[in-house]
Amino acid sequence: MRRVHITVILLAAVIFLLVLHHNILGLSDILKRQNSDTGPLVFQRLESLPDAPDIGPEHGHGEEIAVVIPGVEERLGGLIATINSISSNTKSNVVFYIITTNDTKKHISSWLDGTDLKRVAYKLLTFDARVLDGKVRVDAGAEPVKPMTFARFYLPSLLPGAKKVIYLDDDVIVQDDIVQLYNTPISPGHAAAFSEDCDSVTSKFPVRGGANQYNYIGFLDYKKERIRSLGIKANTCSFNPGVFVANLTEWRRQNITRQLEKWMELDVTEELYSKSLSGNIAAPPLLIVFYRLYSNINPLWHVRHLGSSTGKRYSPQFVKAAKLLHWNGHFKPWGRTSSFPEIWEKWFLPDPSGQFSLIRRHAE
């Protein structure tokens, strides 16, 4: 009798195990079906990563690199060469913001759109010269003041959504990736980075005309009490405002534009600028407002004074190695004579409308 009970118990156990095994197999099938439904969605997402488009700056995407350049009618050849040199040496997402006047916009657009530069991204910004009323002194017999010279003072209002920009004069050629200049470190509390005039690159050579254009005394009249009261030593190294990187967030916070306007207005009534000032009349207020409050640009990213004479102030090897060349001064590379015109001219694109043409000595 006991053996029968044991046999029954064993049979029951076997049946239980068979049922359990069947249920486990069923559950396994269900799980497999569920995995087969959801699996491809998961793994497809992973497998697609290597084929996803690269959106890094080297492919023209990513963070916008805002480059601001003035567009003046009689100097548009310079603007075109600057844009061409930048766009040809970078794959970054560069957008050109061209500050100009209403009567020049059509000419700029037709030139850009009618050449290989139709590929570049650009926006035309209108500068209203009326903001300068009462802020610019006009001396008798002096050359008329060009309003566009002061457009750089108003970058936050011209580009209200921008946080960081590069400003370049139109007599500049860039020979390397502009993103390197854009990535110039700007210290906390500084609204801009400039290139000092006393750096080892530029201070070796004299500047044509005027006083010492490497120090504040070359820009400000130290006979005036208001200038002396600033406590700025006359031999303090100056900087060149033709190339700079601006932190517009900090610029707005410090209200730099209003500070610049204040010194412009004071110059109108008190004549605070140096009488021997040669060149950029926008420099004095910038030098005052940014005194000891700016970061430094790598000197190779602003090799300047190429327009101060027609001679070769730098060796061809050095000019070739420079990241950025600046023909500031009287002798522009699109003019009759200048230094290293062949370097500039390789980036120049002829005007499809024929309104702008190069002036060359051999053309006489």
Curated annotation (Swiss-Prot):
SUPFAM superfamilies: Nucleotide-diphospho-sugar transferases. It is an enzyme of class 2 (transferase). Residues 1-5 are cytoplasmic. GO terms for molecular function: UDP-glycosyltransferase activity. Residues 27-364 are lumenal. It is a single-pass type II membrane protein. The keyword RNA-binding does not apply. Its main location: membrane. InterPro entries: Glyco_trans_8 (IPR002495), Glycosyltrans_8_dom-fam (IPR050748), Nucleotide-diphossugar_trans (IPR029044). Keywords: Glycoprotein, Glycosyltransferase, Membrane, Signal-anchor, Transferase, Transmembrane, Transmembrane helix. It comes from the Eukaryota. GO terms for cellular component: Golgi apparatus; membrane. Glycans are attached at N102, N247, N255. Its EC number is 2.4.1.-. It is found in: Membrane. Gene3D superfamilies: Spore Coat Polysaccharide Biosynthesis Protein SpsA, Chain A (3.90.550.10). Belongs to the glycosyltransferase 8 family. This is Glycosyltransferase 8 domain-containing protein 1. It comes from Xenopus laevis.
